[in-house]
């Protein structure tokens, strides 16, 4: 089980119940989703938040430098999962699905009024624990570079995007990805290499020259796997349970802010029209 969160308020208990007598490795993505979809199992949903939360929060923070916006987007992503869990077709690829939702939600949140670039620079300073202020122009440039990179990752064919999400954004080894996806290790490595080539070529067409080594480093950046505060994880789990209580219960759940509701509803509508 991931060590990125230090649960409290019962969060640890539901995870302990799920993993009692065994390891999280033995519980497949598909089985966790099935358990939640079938019986709204709190422990199963908590495990999904624990397993994929660092990637989701990392993406939200890279695209939304305001931490409150990122937290809202994080909760909205898992609320969408709770509402759509029963209809997921390729449950073993939920990481790829969550990445797509996280990117969509974060980009929608960017359209709302947000902090100035100078404020964004201060946020980055705190996160990186840097003693000197950051150049606002550099912050704006990095923000746009991140947006371009994630836009192009989102445009990759699924067979190339999936290993990028699993290996780079979630930090799994080639062997772990191969076991998860039921692919030969050579296929994982080959598709990652092809994904990098496609990304580099597409970014260059947009006027962004990215050396191969730099691209690999950017994709595997540690901040793409952010430690999830236990309070935030608990709110996401509570929101997921509220979404499963009844078709309308999630709209009035105390655990949900107006922003989280709006972002999740917008994402679901966008997914409907994209079908």
Name each model-derived stretch.
Residues 39, 51-54, 63, 165-172:
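Short helix-capping/turn signature of helix-turn-helix
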Residues 4-21, 26, 67, 72-73, ...:
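Hydrophobic topogenic segments
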Residues 27-32:
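Acidic, Ser/Thr- and Pro/Gly-rich low-complexity regulatory segments
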Residues 41, 61, 86-90:
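Short, flexible helix-adjacent loops and helix caps
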Residues 34-58, 68-71, 82, 151:
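A short, charge-rich alpha-helical start-of-domain segment used by transcription regulators
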């Amino acid at each position: 089980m991931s060590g990125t969160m230090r649960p409290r308020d019962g969060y640890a208990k539901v995870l302990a119940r799920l993993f009692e007598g065994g390891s999280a490795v033995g519980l497949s993505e598909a089985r966790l989703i099935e358990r939640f979809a079938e019986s709204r199992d709190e422990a199963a949903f908590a495990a999904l938040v624990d397993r994929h939360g660092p990637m989701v929060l990392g993406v939200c923070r890279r695209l939304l430098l305001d931490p409150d916006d990122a937290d809202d987007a994080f909760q909205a992503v898992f609320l969408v999962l709770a509402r759509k869990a029963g209809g997921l077709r390729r449950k073993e690829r939920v990481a790829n699905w969550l990445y797509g939702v996280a990117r969509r939600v974060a980009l929608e949140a960017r359209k709302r009024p947000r902090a100035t670039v100078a404020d964004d620079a201060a946020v980055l300073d705190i996160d990186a624990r840097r003693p000197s202020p950051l150049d606002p122009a550099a912050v704006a440039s990095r923000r746009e570079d991140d947006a371009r990179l994630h836009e192009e990752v989102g445009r990759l064919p699924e067979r190339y995007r999936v290993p990028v999400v699993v290996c780079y954004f979630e930090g799994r080894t080639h062997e772990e990805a191969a076991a998860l996806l039921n692919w030969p290790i050579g296929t994982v490595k080959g598709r990652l290499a092809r994904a990098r080539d496609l990304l580099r070529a597409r970014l260059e067409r947009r006027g962004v020259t990215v050396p191969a080594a730099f691209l690999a480093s950017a994709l595997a950046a540690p901040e793409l796997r952010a430690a999830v505060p236990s309070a935030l994880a608990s709110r996401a789990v509570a929101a997921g349970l509220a979404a499963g209580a009844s078709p309308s219960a999630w709209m009035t759940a105390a655990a949900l802010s107006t922003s989280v509701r709006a972002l999740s509803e917008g994402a679901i509508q966008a997914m409907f029209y994209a079908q």
